[in-house]
Amino acid sequence: MKRKVTPREHPLYLKAFRAYIQYVNSGLYFRKEHVVGLENVPVNGTPVVLVANHQNCLNDPLCVCLQLTDRRMNFLARANVFKNPIANKALRAMGLLPAYRMGYEHFSEVSKKNQETLGAACEALADGETVMLYPEAGHQDKRWLGVFKLGYLRIAFAAAEKMEFKQDVMILPSCNHYSNYFHARTDMLIKFGKPISLMPYYERYQQAPRETMMEINKLVRNAIQEMMLHIDDLVHYEQIDFLRENGYGKKYAMEHGFNFNYLPSRLLSDQKLVDALQTATREHPEKMEEIYKDTSTFMEGLKKYNIRDWLFAKSPGVEAAALRGFALLALLPLYLLSIIPTGLLYLIPKIFLKKLIKDQMFVSTFNVAVSVFISVPLCLILPVVLLWVYLGFWWALGYFIAFPLMFILSWNYLRMFWKFVGACNFVRRKNRKGVRELKKLRKKIFNGLDSVLD
């Protein structure tokens, strides 16, 4: 007989705060969020351990939490963020639980505190809630999957034992994928795989717990690796990542029937291309080594002349660069109108980013956090309140509706400006010889890849 469960719900103020974060994260920061496999997520009330790759710090669990709004999510986070008493209370209210690590926390009482966290996670699962963990036990700075720890399975089986092995606990593999880790107005993707039932393993677990967990761990890791972009050739990682992200990746996607501009389709194309490149590296090491060397030279050339790969596909002339300049001048009044109310969204993170953030994978998290707690309150909430008080509801509503449009306009204008700068560098007289050499090298790389991959 199944144990009757009653999943907790977030209080109203936390639901309101989640809606606000969703406005900032999904409405302003990301251009588009894609979700694939939502039908694989077990219904609320089912004990679920959701596991995923971890590549973008807070954004990984945040985006999942904002998609699974039908349930209370519980996350394990590094214990150092719980040191402040106010933060400790707030984070626990939102479903975060502290995970103490020997390498980062004081050794004493670590085991005892982790047992408390384990008990809280088991209680949440026993109540039919969802617990999300990252088995790599830390974020990666590359698009690859690290070694999985067994902690998530220990929690899952401990919860099953708490329920006397009478109720199923599900492991839900998931993956996070980003078109760009560091920039706003880019796309992100969440994929949910088929859930893995632990009930068929209960009897074996009671006889041989570690062997059973290792077997399941392999299944879970393979499921996540198949969903994500996994580049395991770390020796040539930078070159492979550049090739799939730029002109050759777009060419490959189009030739193989994928949509390069639609992230779920582009991920499939990137997976296919990366597998082909890594296979070619094993089968034709000398040819691929030359291609990777040329790719490194090409990347250095782009950096030297401050240009991007897309310019070689467009090949703009002086006239095209001039037209971009005239377009920027024509749109300048609109940009100024849009940047005045939204400027702090750009300025405040820039002020503190270099001083506070040492790990580049925290950049996106920092930008979202600053927007939620500082920039958006100053740029949006405060003006809306003042307009409502002094000018009336309709002025406040108009500003609220116009604000995201102004932010998107200012962001796209800045993108146009930097593309204009790149086009100018591309056609500058003193750069022409170097650009011609890079163009030849790019063609050589493309031809070399076509001959090896076909």
Where are these predicted regions, by residue range?
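Short, contiguous pre-domain boundary segments
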Residues: M1-T6
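Soluble catalytic domains of membrane acyltransferases
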Residues: P7-E211, V220, V318, L334-D454
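Short, well-structured alpha-helical interface segments that form or flank functional binding sites
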Residues: G151, E215, L328, L332
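Long, charge-rich alpha-helical interaction segments
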Residues: E211, K218-L311
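Membrane-proximal, non-transmembrane alpha-helical segments
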Residues: D275-K354
